[in-house]
Curated annotation (Swiss-Prot):
GO terms for biological process: cell division; cell wall organization; peptidoglycan biosynthetic process; regulation of cell shape. It is an enzyme of class 1 (oxidoreductase). Gene3D superfamilies: 3.30.465.10, UDP-N-acetylenolpyruvoylglucosamine reductase, C-terminal domain, Uridine Diphospho-n-acetylenolpyruvylglucosamine Reductase, domain 2. This is UDP-N-acetylenolpyruvoylglucosamine reductase. Pathway: Cell wall biogenesis; peptidoglycan biosynthesis. The gene is murB.
Length: 299
């Protein structure tokens, strides 16, 4: 039995929970607002023998038009953070929005998260993906995460060294672990006005060079370093290329936007078209940053 704190809902359109604004219904949905509620929800799914998927802000996420069986756990209400301006330690729950945390850190004179202000994700998602932008990344400042097994077990802590960080990757992508919270160690003692100015400048740069006002997942493909995915795609004249309501952004070619009536199938088809054309032209396979849920085949 679930406690009365958790409202179990059924047949909920996941388009309302993703930044692409696509996705079919979740069979069951829970939105825990605390660590205890999150652990309770995981335990309930196990007791009911339900497959369980955990999502954050719904960025970097493509959910199938047919939706998701079992339980979907949205952590977007699992918010909260404490910042110590003296020693730079920041403790944040998994659903805390990264832009919110970046702004709070700036106001506290803490340097380290200014690069992240335009990332439309959560602390948990940033840890899983090793999110990064403008020369910074999560691994640079993350000290540890508290996680729980998706199925059974108690929560435990993993240090930065145990997370096996790489470019847009961590071991959390390979194991069935749910991020509950994270600890960052930032640089204290900076001028809040200066850090705020830098943070605001980073956001202005992102909004002027990326389709910030249209539904998207952020960057679709990992950069095949030292090359840039967006430049490869743009070089093939694919800006503005469309499948249904999905379009390669005319502002930044590594973004696919929902022009208003896109389906997950439209977006998936456009991703594959871009991959095929880049591979044909450059013998390079572009690997998506996007996590696909409800799809059977690999991208």
């Amino acid at each position: 039995m679930l406690s009365t704190r958790l409202a179990l809902r059924s047949n909920i359109p996941m388009a309302d929970f993703t930044t692409w604004r696509v996705g079919g219904p979740a069979q069951w949905l829970l939105e825990p607002a605390s660590v205890d509620e999150t652990l309770e929800a995981l335990q309930w799914a196990q007791q009911e023998h339900l497959p369980c998927r955990v999502i954050g802000a719904g960025s970097n996420l493509l959910i199938h038009d047919d939706g998701l069986p079992g339980l979907t756990l949205s952590l977007r209400k699992l918010q909260g953070a404490s910042l110590n301006a003296e020693n730079g330690v920041v403790e944040a729950l998994a659903g805390e929005p990264i832009p919110t945390l970046a702004r709070r850190a700036a106001r506290a004179g803490l340097n380290g998260l200014a690069w992240s202000v335009g990332i439309p994700g959560t602390v948990g998602g940033a840890a899983v993906m090793n999110a990064g932008a403008q020369g910074g990344c999560t691994a640079d400042w993350l000290e540890s995460v508290r996680v729980a097994p998706l199925v059974g077990g108690v929560s435990f802590e993993l240090s930065r060294d145990e997370l096996d960080f790489d470019y847009r990757h961590s071991r959390l992508q390979d194991e069935e672990l749910v991020v509950l919270s994270a600890r960052f160690r930032l640089e204290p003692g900076h001028d809040p006005e200066e850090i705020t100015r830098i943070t605001s400048g980073n956001l202005s740069h992102r909004t002027s060079t990326q389709p910030y006002t249209q539904p998207s997942c952020g960057s679709v493909f990992r950069n095949p370093e030292p090359l840039k995915a967006g430049r490869l795609i743009e070089g093939l004249g694919l800006k503005g290329n469309r499948v249904g309501g999905a379009e390669v952004s005319t502002l930044h070619a590594n973004f696919i936007v929902n022009t208003g009536a896109a389906t997950a199938a439209d977006i998936d088809s456009l991703i594959q078209r871009v991959q095929q054309q880049v591979e044909a032209a450059h013998s390079l396979h572009l690997h998506p940053e996007v996590k696909r849920l409800g799809f059977t085949e690999a991208a």
